[in-house]
């Protein structure tokens, strides 16, 4: 389930981990909206820690990485702007139909592409290849990234694991070797990998 995060305690932990050699803070979350308040308070606590103590500033200025499903509001994006150094963003579906069917979200393409464009200078995009979705999802995703974001870092991922998808037998399996090759060929064909 998790626990309520204390921003001051998190800031002290980030500082301690940085001294021990941590090179970034990775905010992992799917949808960031419920966590934005904690992220912002933690960043403020880090700044306060520097002013209130003799903490070494080198260890307080740790790059902030936001690891997200990229499906969030414009308000959330504005709050995170200037706080997050690198966006590690998932671009899972290449169309609204698949996003609605499997993730039950509306306006997926509009939302995700808007957020990708907004964070494009500090961005790495990940695309999880799903079984049977090379043409409907991988192809359009790769094409959009290639057309819109020429210099972005792009990662094609094959570790899809079926979980709680018995209602969707078409994706209730691992990605086959043939599907891996097909997705790789799509990305290579557009010079994205």
Language-model features: locations:
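Short, flexible active-site recognition loops that position polar ligands and cofactors
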Residues: 168-179
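Conserved AdoMet/S-adenosylmethionine-binding subsite of the radical SAM
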Residues: 8-11, 15-169
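Short amphipathic alpha-helical surface patches that serve as generic macromolecular interface elements
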Residues: 138-142, 177-184
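Catalytic cores of large soluble enzymes that bind and process phosphate-bearing ligands
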Residues: 2, 133, 175
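C-terminal accessory region of radical SAM enzymes
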Residues: 121-123, 179-193
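Canonical Radical SAM [4Fe-4S] cluster-binding loop centered on the CxxxCxxC motif
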Residues: 1-6, 171
